[in-house]
């Protein structure tokens, strides 16, 4: 199976621009940002409830705890949100003004929770319609590749990804020509 595409900054901006002009723009933007800026799996994103992401005062948490049932490996883990993601999510949370903290964080057009499969298909079609041939895993792969390019160690990356084996994490990381050029300049 081919690896999911990693996006250039320009491609990522084009994707967000495309999404901004379509139905459910805010929801779709937030789904993409969580994928690209936290490295969460699509199934984990689909499983999120308001209470997972938002504290009792209505503020987006910077660290969220996924229980074992929410993760692929069935091991609870903490996901860290960068400040820029928390700020974007706060706008979404405030716009939704949800009172029921048990409600899904992302809902389909029909008002139901996304399943992992439906969200995977949703990402696939968002990408396809925006002109990108890739899968729902692109955001996660992009997240790990970008952090690797910035010098973050493989053990930290594995922990952020929820991988117990660094060999798995290494398969996610793309080594672009720009990364190689920058690497040799460090000599």
Predicted regions and their residues:
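Basic, Lys/Arg- and aromatic-enriched nucleic-acid-binding interface segment
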Residues: 9-38, 42
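Conserved tyrosine-mediated DNA breakage-rejoining catalytic core shared by Y-recombinases
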Residues: 47-76, 80, 85
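N-terminal core-binding DNA-recognition domain of tyrosine site-specific recombinases/integrases
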Residues: 4, 23-26, 76, 113-117, ...
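Short, basic (Lys/Arg/His-rich) helix/loop patches that form interaction surfaces
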Residues: 17-24, 120-159
């Amino acid at each position: 199976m081919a690896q999911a595409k990693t996006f250039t900054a320009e491609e990522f901006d084009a994707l967000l621009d495309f999404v901004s002009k379509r139905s459910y723009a805010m929801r779709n933007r937030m789904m993409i940002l969580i994928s690209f800026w936290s490295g969460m799996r699509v199934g984990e994103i689909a499983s999120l409830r308001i209470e997972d992401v938002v504290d009792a005062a209505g503020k987006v948490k910077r660290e969220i705890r996924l229980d074992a049932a929410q993760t692929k490996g069935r091991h609870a883990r903490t996901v860290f949100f960068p400040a820029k993601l928390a700020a974007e999510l706060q706008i979404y949370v405030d716009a939704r003004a949800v009172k029921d903290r048990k409600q899904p964080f992302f809902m389909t057009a029909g008002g139901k929770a996304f399943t992992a499969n439906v969200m995977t298909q949703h990402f696939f079609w968002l990408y396809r319609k925006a002109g990108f041939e890739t899968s729902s895993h692109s955001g996660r792969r992009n997240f790990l590749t970008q952090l690797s390019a910035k010098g973050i160690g493989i053990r930290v990356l594995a922990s952020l990804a929820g991988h117990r084996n660094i060999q798995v994490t290494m398969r996610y990381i793309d080594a672009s020509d720009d990364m190689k050029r920058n690497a040799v300049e460090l000599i």
